[in-house]
């Protein structure tokens, strides 16, 4: 997770340095002004699009070579057909017939869906949001890295504090409540502040700060969702992985409201997500029956 977030911090800065130029702010303003004829505007937009092609080709080649390396590397085989004796014992005296008989597992998969969606929204939309609040794009390009930096801090504190000083369940409750509070800050904060050398609306920094509680939520949801599954653990884990589709779906929901109303109103999508996460952290993971 830490290596992943380090890459996430560095990569936007590298791509921005490769793609954005010092005079692009004037170029963007000119394109949005409406002063250009259609042919000139399209030519400028095409030039901007062309900049991303080579970096993505290079990235694709790197991923291809990595995949080939993994394919021919000597890695131990994982025998998924071996049934753990403990799993069998866990289910020996239960009438559970499928994963659908574990309500807390289904609720956990939904929790992961909402959680990963809020992660992507907080990271991927912040540049456009900062720009809509009057910040130059060349200045706003660093904000995804700030969000991921907050996530890194959360990971490190989690390693130090959990479970020695704080239980994973209490950490989950605290992080979901903090995420909810920060989400209200994003949609309600209406004052400027200066942080990290940037003077901007406080809601932008609240969006950055969401990276911190989001760091520990996934690790809290997972064990609470698969405990006691026994022989259904592998299938249950697969269901939780399917919850990662929230990465793709919730940003579209945000985009719908952002297009219909405003970028800031779009962030109201975060509120019900975190309300549900608070519910799961406090109550949902304890529900053992649908009745």
Language-model-detected regions and their locations in the chain:
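C-terminal membrane-cytosol helix-exit motif in multi-pass small-molecule transporters
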Residues: 15-24, 47, 57-87, 280-285
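Helix-to-loop junctions at the C-terminal end of transmembrane segments
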Residues: 19, 154-168, 258
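Juxtamembrane intracellular "pre-TM" segments in multi-pass secondary transporters
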Residues: 78-108
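C-terminal transmembrane helical hairpin of 12-TM major facilitator-type secondary transporters
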Residues: 168-221
């Amino acid at each position: 997770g830490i290596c992943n977030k380090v890459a996430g911090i560095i990569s936007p800065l590298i791509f921005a340095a490769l793609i954005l130029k010092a005079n692009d702010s004037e170029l963007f303003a000119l394109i949005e002004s409406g002063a250009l004829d259609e042919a000139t505007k399209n030519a400028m937009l095409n030039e901007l699009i062309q900049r991303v092609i080579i970096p993505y080709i290079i990235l694709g080649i790197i991923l291809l070579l990595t995949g080939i390396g993994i394919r021919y590397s000597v890695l131990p085989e994982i025998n998924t057909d071996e049934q753990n004796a403990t799993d069998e014992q866990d289910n020996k005296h239960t009438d559970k017939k499928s994963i659908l008989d574990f309500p807390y597992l289904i609720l956990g998969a939904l929790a992961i869906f909402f959680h990963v969606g809020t992660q992507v929204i907080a990271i991927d939309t912040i540049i456009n949001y900062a720009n809509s609040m009057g910040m130059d794009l060349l200045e706003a390009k660093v904000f995804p890295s700030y969000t991921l930096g907050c996530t890194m801090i959360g990971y490190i504190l989690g390693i130090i504090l959990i479970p020695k000083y704080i239980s994973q369940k209490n950490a989950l409750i605290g992080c979901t409540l903090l995420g909810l509070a920060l989400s209200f800050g994003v949609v309600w904060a209406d004052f400027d502040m200066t942080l990290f050398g940037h003077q901007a609306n406080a809601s932008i920094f609240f969006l950055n700060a969401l990276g911190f509680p989001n760091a520990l939520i996934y690790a809290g949801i997972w064990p609470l969702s698969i405990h006691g599954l026994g022989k259904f653990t592998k299938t249950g884990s697969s269901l939780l992985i399917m919850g990662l589709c929230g990465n793709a779906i919730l940003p579209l929901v945000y985009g719908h409201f952002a297009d219909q109303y405003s970028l800031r109103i779009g962030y109201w999508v975060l509120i019900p997500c975190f309300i549900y996460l608070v519910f799961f952290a406090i109550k949902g993971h304890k529900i053992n029956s649908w009745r």
